[in-house]
Amino acid sequence: MKKLGKLLLGLISLVATIAAAFLVWIQCSWDRDHDAHPTPQLKASTDPAVIKQGEYVVRALAHCGDCHSPKGSEGQASDAAPQMVGGRVFDVPVFGKFISPNITPEHATGVGAWTDEELARVLRTGVSRDGHMRPFMATIAPMADEDLVAVISYLRTLPGARGATVDDQPTLIGKFVIKGMEPDRRAAPPYVPAGGVSVERGRYLALGPANCAGCHSASSPQSGLLPEAPYLAGALEPMLDETDPSMEFAPPNLTPDKDTGHIYNWDEDGFVARFKAGRVYKGSHMPWESFGRMTEEDVRSIYRFLRALPPTHRELGPTRRPRGYAKPS
């Protein structure tokens, strides 16, 4: 018995030592340096047409203010210049708290001291100026060089304002996930300019700047939190209703599956009307205020792309339901 007791104590001690070593390893190495990752050689433009294009991408398609405004989408409801000073807190269960940064050209707390190339890198790959990963930025969809230059050009015209200086607060699990993340190496997609209605423009928007696939597809730490195929078949994990913690939202299946496709029975005019109608639930994660600024041509293009997708059968249940809802088997 004494030998067995010593053996058990030895095993417990070994496990504790390994666990402690693992914790120290994560704490000391989670914030990896990716500064060697290539920086896109892109420069901002002062061309008014390019700046106007950037304003449309920032304020409508890419819904940047949904994260980089303290009030999220609510702060983007007016036509006034957006207050991109950051400070919005994203409390992600299990993974920690993440605070959006100031992206105005203010030097002390914003991106005024950043080069155009550094801005291009964080927007395209998620690698920040200091070489470290910005987890949320690493998951935004890639956009063509033309739109990326336009975004940077527009951001340079915003009034500089002091903003958030609080660091992210990832949990140990969050640090472990961030440690495993790699810079986004997806190639920039071919540019499909605005003008007219087409499936090609809809594909570019839904998988690019508008990032429909980012919320309406499954993702996991194994995929680097990037969308997993089949794209746009709905998210497997719900999102909490920030205004009512007893409720949650399930980003629905947008493929044309006749049984589980959320918009299967919608016609094109109905799809456009829904975007014009705006927010129904205050706590919805859908950036209705920003998407309400999209041109009708772009909304119709997205609809036509969604209708051209292969149907995927994925039953997700109600889009808004009590927290912890049991999915149909």
Regions found by a protein language model. Give the residues of each.
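The canonical Cys-X-X-Cys-His
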Residues: G54, L61-K71, V151, G202-L205, ...
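Small-residue-rich helix-loop
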Residues: P221-G224
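N-terminal type II signal-anchor transmembrane helix
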Residues: M1-D33
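C-terminal capping alpha-helices of c-type cytochrome domains
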Residues: L23, T115-R129, T139-T165, D267-Y281, ...
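Extracytoplasmic/periplasmic/luminal assembly and interaction segments
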Residues: Y56-F98
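Extended surface/linker regions that mediate inter-domain or inter-protein docking
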Residues: S13-A16, A20-L23, A138-R203, S301-F305
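Electron-transfer interface patches adjacent to heme c in soluble/periplasmic c-type cytochromes
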Residues: M84-E118, T139-L148, P230-R274, W288-V299
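Electrostatic cytochrome c docking/interface patches
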Residues: D35-R59, I178-L207, T260
